[in-house]
Amino acid sequence: MSWLQVVVLSVLQGLTEFLPVSSSGHLAIASRVFFEDDAGASFTAVCQLGTEAAVLVYFARDIARILKAWFAGLFGSGERSPDYWLGWWVIIGTIPISVIGLLFKDEIRTGARNLWLVATAMIVFSFVIAAAEYAGRQTRRVEQLTWRDSVIVGFAQCLALVPGVSRSGATISAGLFLGMDRELAARFGFLLAIPAVFASGLFSLPDAFAPVGEGMSATGPQLLVSTVIAFVVGYAAVAWFLRFLVRHSMYWFVGYRIILGSVVLILLSTGVVAAI
């Protein structure tokens, strides 16, 4: 892997991780279109450590408040606060992707990164996002969340294991279908992703140096620089996206996903780009 590839893919990871456009799908597409080789699931997972560190810093006060309330409720007595229960909902919601990610890790690293699948998922899931935006009541608040919401959003997060779907797109859509407003759905989805993505990145760290199957390999310094770039760009992206959701819908991203997916399908059909 060249330094140009590291910089381009890391910036792309930071820009797209929190938007409902699929960062892993973008990395798979960009690496094949411009560099004629897949970045690999392991490099992608390690690169995501930078963007998840960004969301960890951005939500530091929220996380500290939730942890404080969770431990206080766990070992104390009296009425439990909404933050106490939110801590439990994050834990419960992390279980589905932890189990499914381990069971299907080999498929995720290899077959799931086929560009035919990525482009198709990009287009098909666009209609799910549009339906969620159209049907969502957007009236429920954080204190109204239950363990059922956590389980449903947790299983929605599992869809992001398929490049082209989008973790934020899946969790925000699930939240909208459950009646959450856009900002709550995004915040809850981002909190839910932190433990899962950190675990995935650390687990994939050894494989990033020697990818399983096809994929570029990266050196230690390249992985470090990649993580730092993804952190800086990702922090700016999450701050912008949460402000965007307050005033705007996700229909903007639906159109973008359909156009990008269609372009990739055309490139694949004409033989300009290889699927694997």
Curated annotation (Swiss-Prot):
Top-level taxonomic group: Bacteria
Coiled coil: none
E.C. designation(s): 3.6.1.27
Major site of localization recorded for this protein: membrane
Residue ranges of the TM segments: 1-21, 39-59, 84-104, 115-135, 159-179, 190-210, 222-242, 253-273
Location in the cell: Cell membrane
Key words, A-Z: Antibiotic resistance, Cell membrane, Cell shape, Cell wall biogenesis/degradation, Hydrolase, Membrane, Peptidoglycan synthesis, Transmembrane, Transmembrane helix
Bilayer topology annotation: Multi-pass membrane protein
Disulfide bridge partners, by residue number: none
Catalytic activity line of the entry: di-trans,octa-cis-undecaprenyl diphosphate + H2O = di-trans,octa-cis-undecaprenyl phosphate + phosphate + H(+)
Entry-linked InterPro entries: UppP
GO cellular component, one term: plasma membrane
Family per record: Belongs to the UppP family.
Remarks, miscellaneous: Bacitracin is thought to be involved in the inhibition of peptidoglycan synthesis by sequestering undecaprenyl diphosphate, thereby reducing the pool of lipid carrier available.
Cited PANTHER family: UNDECAPRENYL-DIPHOSPHATASE
NCBIfam families, per database record: PRK00281.2-1 (NF001392), undec_PP_bacA (TIGR00753)
Role: Catalyzes the dephosphorylation of undecaprenyl diphosphate (UPP). Confers resistance to bacitracin.
Protein name per Swiss-Prot or TrEMBL: Undecaprenyl-diphosphatase
